[in-house]
């Protein structure tokens, strides 16, 4: 799933921000699995 759950680590959180900013233009705390 693309939005599976909340991010637990800073690294994953940062990557999720970059990914979601490019794809959806949103600033949320989800990560890809």
From Swiss-Prot:
Top-level taxon: Eukaryota
Q: What is this protein called?
A: Plasminogen
Activity sensitivity to pH? Optimum pH is 8.
Q: Where in the cell is it found?
A: Secreted
At the highest ranks, the source species' classification is:
Eukaryota, Metazoa, Chordata, Craniata, Vertebrata
Which UniProt keywords are present, listed alphabetically?
Blood coagulation, Fibrinolysis, Hemostasis, Hydrolase, Protease, Secreted, Serine protease, Zymogen
Cellular component GO terms, alphabetically? extracellular region
Reaction equations catalysed: Preferential cleavage: Lys-|-Xaa > Arg-|-Xaa, higher selectivity than trypsin. Converts fibrin into soluble products
Similarity-based family? Belongs to the peptidase S1 family. Plasminogen subfamily.
Indicate whether tRNA processing appears among the record's keywords. Answer: no
GO MF terms, alphabetically ordered: serine-type endopeptidase activity
